[in-house]
């Protein structure tokens, strides 16, 4: 006899019970890119079965996913949780002015309390939209507060404090010596890398070439490579003005400067790449360096449109990221999915330049590959971690036609997400956060955002 079938959102469903996601369209993103009508059986933190699932004898929590896509959770490979409080405070400025006039003063004004509130705001937004893994770059100080917020939220994440030991216009609150920067990064790595049963990882984060000495870049590379699984995370080739400033200061481009210091290779994730030349793409591909496409941020800061089609053709591995709230202003993966697909078509004057499936891959399995964790997440396959999102496909904005993948990329929005699991844990159920109080997050963000702005005198 079959065991009892208990609804997943029931107050009486025992924690730790198996979960069966029943009757959805499963968008696996596996090597065969299968899209199948199937059930997904979760046990603990693992995907146990995909197919026709009989309820286990000991019972299961059941989610009715009819009319929904069951997909891997989104993997965002470049975000700034520390900037979530700054939404709407830095609009309509180009990159370097945006940094010097708004972002750096605001970051310098953070204290531990405001940074914690900022991280919770960004995490809540992304989790509700189906994001299950992030690569985050923090600000210079108080980064334990970010890791604490991530740990409490249930998000899978790599994160690291920003490293800055030089730069024009850097406020006092962001200034640090090379020794201080490396020592604090090492302390954070020792404390947080591998924490939460491996759900958290560390990424050394030299901000960009203009804010880091050669000594700091080399030190970050050496430190990252000394510990398995630790990443390097920076910005590169984002804006023409930035590239000119680097050439004026160093006599070479930022990609050359990073490569000379060891900030390349399979454990390096660089954001943007808008200004990359073809020869640089080929060299980065040979080195195995990963990149993140941030289409909305690149548009808002007038950086340009990254040639993602050329990057992928050169052999580069590219993920997707919303970047930060003050340069987007959303942290919504559905926005980035759609933008990535549409902008590739415009960049190439070719409607077929990027298919919906390719865009979805960047936001899921390719994002996991960028972070080196594709053996564990990024696709729905038996034995992988239970990181998934359930997304309604029956909204008026998605009907009446189109396959599940096309609907996810071109039609769906964040509010279509009903459930999110990370490591088998229900983080979002029926559109509501289970790990964070959304109302408290919003109210605290309003209060702390006002305090930061006053301290920054903006």
Regions found by a protein language model. Name each.
Residues 1-38, 43-48, 53, 364-458:
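Active-site microenvironment of metallo-dependent hydrolases
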Residues 87-155, 181-197, 446-454:
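Alpha-helical scaffold segments that flank or form the walls of functional sites
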Residues 146-274:
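Metal-coordinating catalytic core of metallo-dependent amide/deamination hydrolases
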Residues 154-156, 221-229, 263-266, 283-292, ...:
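Glycine-enriched alpha-helix->loop->beta-strand junction motifs that scaffold or abut catalytic
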Residues 260-267, 309-395, 411:
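His/Asp/Glu-enriched, well-ordered alpha-helical/loop segment
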């Amino acid at each position: 006899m079959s065991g009892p079938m208990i609804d997943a959102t029931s107050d009486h469903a025992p924690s730790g019970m198996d979960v069966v996601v029943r009757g959805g369209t499963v968008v696996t993103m596996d090597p065969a890119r299968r899209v199948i009508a199937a059930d997904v059986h979760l046990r603990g933190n693992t995907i146990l079965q995909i197919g026709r699932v009989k309820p286990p004898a000991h019972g299961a929590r059941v989610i009715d996913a009819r009319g929904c896509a069951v997909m891997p959770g989104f993997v965002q490979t470049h975000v700034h949780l520390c900037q979530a409080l700054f939404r709407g405070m830095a609009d309509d400025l180009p990159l370097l002015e945006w940094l010097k006039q708004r972002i750096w003063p605001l970051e310098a004004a953070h204290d531990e309390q405001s940074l914690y509130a900022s991280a919770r705001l960004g995490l809540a937004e992304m989790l509700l939209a189906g994001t299950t893994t992030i690569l985050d770059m923090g600000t210079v100080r108080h980064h334990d507060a970010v890791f604490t917020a991530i740990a409490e939220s249930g998000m899978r994440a790599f994160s690291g404090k920003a490293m800055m030991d030089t730069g024009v216009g850097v406020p006092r609150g962001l200034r640090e010596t090379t020794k201080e920067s490396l020592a604090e990064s090492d302390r954070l790595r020792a404390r947080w890398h591998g924490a939460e049963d491996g759900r958290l990882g560390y990424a050394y984060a030299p901000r960009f070439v203009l804010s880091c000495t050669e000594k700091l870049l080399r030190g970050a590379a050496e430190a990252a490579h000394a510990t398995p699984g630790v990443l390097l995370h920076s910005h590169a080739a984002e804006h023409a003005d930035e590239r000119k400033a680097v050439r004026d200061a160093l006599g070479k481009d930022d990609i050359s400067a990073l490569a000379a210091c060891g900030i390349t290779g399979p454990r390096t994730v660089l954001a943007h790449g808008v200004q990359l030349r073809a020869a640089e793409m080929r060299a980065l591909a040979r080195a195995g360096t990963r990149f993140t496409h941030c289409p909305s941020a690149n548009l808002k800061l007038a950086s340009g449109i990254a040639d993602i089609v050329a990057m992928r053709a050169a052999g580069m591995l590219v993920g997707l990221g919303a970047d930060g709230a003050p340069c987007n202003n959303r942290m919504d993966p559905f926005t980035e999915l759609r933008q990535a697909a549409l902008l590739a078509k415009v960049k190439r004057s070719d409607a077929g330049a990027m298919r919906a499936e390719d865009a979805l891959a960047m936001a899921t399995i390719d994002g996991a590959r960028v972070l080196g964790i594709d053996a564990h997440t990024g696709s729905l396959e038996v034995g992988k971690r239970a990181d998934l999102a359930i997304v309604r496909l029956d909204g008026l904005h998605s009907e009446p036609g189109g396959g599940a993948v096309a609907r996810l990329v071109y039609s769906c929005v964040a509010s279509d997400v009903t459930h999110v699991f990370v490591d088998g844990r229900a983080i979002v159920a029926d559109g509501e956060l289970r790990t964070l109080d959304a109302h408290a997050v919003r109210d605290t963000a309003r209060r702390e955002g006002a305090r930061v702005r006053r301290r920054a005198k903006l």
